[in-house]
């Protein structure tokens, strides 16, 4: 880890959920095709359940919940949410209760199937986006308090200042690995949904004085909202840490193809191509769109000569949308 990051984060309660450093993998065939060195930070291999980026945030979020004496976690997401499932699974692992506030069609596939297999309490509502359900989460929290419980609300994607600490710590790990391997990285690329991971990458990179730029790929086609959310998270996290560092302006590009969760032929073909060329599995909601954006920007010369992709996980998305993807590939 990075000593400056360790010192900054030492006063915040953290539960260890990731037992190892996630590896950095080189993609030789993709690199040859693009004429750019492409590396992947395998945060799909974080170890708990289906893995993924959210577990870095949960180390601090659940550490905070336990330090406050909370006994039940409430969080929000789409029916196929990776974040919602791993949050509930991690909570159960720690002996906590969990309630998931979900939106979308109730279909027993992907993460929703895992929710049911693990006996996780789910409540389905109608909403255009997960942030609209924060009020519902607060109402559920009041209901649980009436039952004598002490709930802890985690916002969509774990996008809060406390959650952002997880990716500041992740940058400390990444920076140390890159130096140890003797790599020069021009650009780090990340999928942007709720924005917490990207905010942590921006702030963490500023703290360690990294030489790379951090690019976000908007998977929801809500780029201006994403930029504002990221800026707000960065400022609030700086306040939490008590620091004042200059942070790169968000560089977020729209590759959402019109909407969050919209499955398109271009991304389905990309997922197949990357899988067969490199043995690397991407999902159609987050990492597939983000890697599509990476390849398009790299071809335009916008990412420099060496790029590192943060693989944020999301494998169940393949199974949730598998039939749609197969139809698009015919």
From Swiss-Prot:
InterPro entries: ACCD_DCysDesulf (IPR027278), D-Cys_desShydrase (IPR005966), TrpB-like_PALP (IPR001926), TrpB-like_PALP_sf (IPR036052). GO terms for molecular function: 1-aminocyclopropane-1-carboxylate deaminase activity; D-cysteine desulfhydrase activity. Its cofactor is pyridoxal 5'-phosphate. Gene3D superfamilies: 3.40.50.1100. Keywords: Hydrolase, Pyridoxal phosphate. The keyword Hydrolase applies. It catalyses: 1-aminocyclopropane-1-carboxylate + H2O = 2-oxobutanoate + NH4(+). Its EC number is 3.5.99.7. It comes from the Archaea. The modification N6-(pyridoxal phosphate)lysine is found at residue 54. It is an enzyme of class 3 (hydrolase). Belongs to the ACC deaminase/D-cysteine desulfhydrase family. This is Putative 1-aminocyclopropane-1-carboxylate deaminase. It comes from Pyrococcus abyssi (strain GE5 / Orsay). The lineage of its organism: Archaea, Methanobacteriati, Methanobacteriota, Thermococci, Thermococcales.
